[in-house]
Each structure stands twice: as structure tokens, then as C-alpha cells.
């Protein structure tokens, strides 16, 4: 199966590429972090069109996002909102044009109307359903991360413990959270890709 992974350097995407390759799947990576011309914010991109046209399934993981500290700082800023709107509009248009099976990575935050990130993901879910794609809602995916500006809570805790000897929480610590290891998320994505036509 030929997989196109949009957002292939991100928290889930980087793990997904390795996971799929380890399983013997064909993978095309696509991420602005690797090549500047792989910018989903740009409406005209013939290379992306070719990748979408020739793949079997698209994993739409690309989004301008990070952990809580990144969202607190950026999610209500013009650049954050417009970056993600452009990514969605351009990508969904190509998915519609080529009528390609795809999985859209959403978030439990799509239920949180006070969050710009959540509202953007909720819009993405609506468009995905309209185009016949699959929505997967993730919550607190963790695994190895390389970008400290966008890192998530587990990575942050490990770094604090290692370098500071103290873990400073952003909350009072009384709430409970669900966490999903990145490889487990990847396993679920591959199962969905393989069973896509039956769902």
C-alpha cells in the first residue's frame, strides 16, 4: 500500500513514517520541515498533486501545532489561525479533486469551542465527513520529540526531571488525562488504512 504522510516530521507523523516503513509499507513523506517547497499553505503545488494522485491513502496529520505551552502562546494569533486554515483549504481541495481516501487527524480539543485550535480541528472534521474521509481524534500522544518549542507534556516532564531535578506542572495536578503512545497511534492508523473501504 502506498501511503502519503502529510506532516511527516510531526509528533505523530515522524513515528508513523518509521512504523509504516518497518511494516514494509511504501511511504512518501511530505513536510515543510524537510523541504521548504513542501508547504501546504501554498495553493499551487504540482508535486503534491502528483503525490496525492499516485498514493493509495493520505494521512492528513499536518497542522501548525504543539503541546500546551505552544498552544497557549500561539493559538489565538493571526499566523496560527491562517496557517492552519490555508493548510486545510489547500489539502482538502486536492483530496476532493482526486477523490482520494484519507484519514484526518483531529483532537479531543475539537469539542472545546473556547480553543481556536479546537475550532479549526472541528471544521476539519466537518469537511472530512463531507468528503467521505475518516476522522481520528487523538488526545495527548507522546513519544520521542526533537522540537522543544512544540514538545508535549510527557517529553517536558522527562526533560525537567533530567535537567532540573524537579517537575513543574502547568496545573495543580488534580485532573486526570489519557495518554496514547505514538506507536500505538500508528498501529491504529495502519489498521484504518487497511480496512478503509470496509468502514
Where would I find each of the regions flagged by the language model?
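SDR active-site strand-loop-helix element
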Residues: 6, 30, 58-64, 102-108, ...
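NAD(P)H-binding glycine-rich loop region in Rossmannoid oxidoreductase-like domains
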Residues: 48-83
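Conserved cofactor-binding/catalytic machinery of classical short-chain dehydrogenase/reductase
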Residues: 83-90, 101, 123-124, 181-184
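NAD(P)-dependent short-chain dehydrogenase/reductase
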Residues: 114-118, 122-193
Amino acid at each position: 500500500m502506498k501511503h502519503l504522510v502529510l506532516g511527516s516530521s510531526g509528533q505523530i507523523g515522524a513515528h508513523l513514517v518509521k512504523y509504516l516503513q518497518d511494516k514494509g509499507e511504501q511511504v512518501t513523506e511530505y513536510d515543510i520541515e524537510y523541504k521548504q517547497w513542501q508547504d501546504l499553505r501554498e495553493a499551487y503545488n504540482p508535486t503534491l498533486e502528483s503525490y496525492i494522485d499516485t498514493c493509495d491513502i493520505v494521512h492528513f496529520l499536518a497542522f501548525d501545532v504543539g503541546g500546551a505551552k505552544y498552544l497557549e502562546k500561539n493559538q489565538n494569533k493571526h499566523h496560527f489561525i491562517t496557517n492552519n486554515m490555508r493548510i486545510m483549504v489547500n489539502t482538502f481541495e486536492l483530496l476532493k479533486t482526486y477523490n482520494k481516501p484519507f484519514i484526518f487527524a483531529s483532537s479531543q480539543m475539537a469539542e472545546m469551542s473556547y480553543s481556536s485550535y479546537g475550532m479549526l480541528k472541528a471544521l476539519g472534521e466537518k469537511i472530512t465527513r463531507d468528503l467521505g474521509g475518516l476522522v481520528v481524534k487523538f488526545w495527548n500522544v507522546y513519544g520521542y520529540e526533537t522540537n522543544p518549542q512544540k514538545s508535549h507534556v510527557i517529553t517536558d516532564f522527562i526533560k525537567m526531571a533530567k535537567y532540573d531535578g524537579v517537575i513543574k506542572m502547568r496545573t495543580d495536578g488534580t485532573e486526570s488525562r489519557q495518554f496514547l503512545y505514538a506507536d500505538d497511534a500508528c498501529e491504529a492508523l495502519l489498521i484504518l488504512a487497511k480496512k478503509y473501504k470496509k468502514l
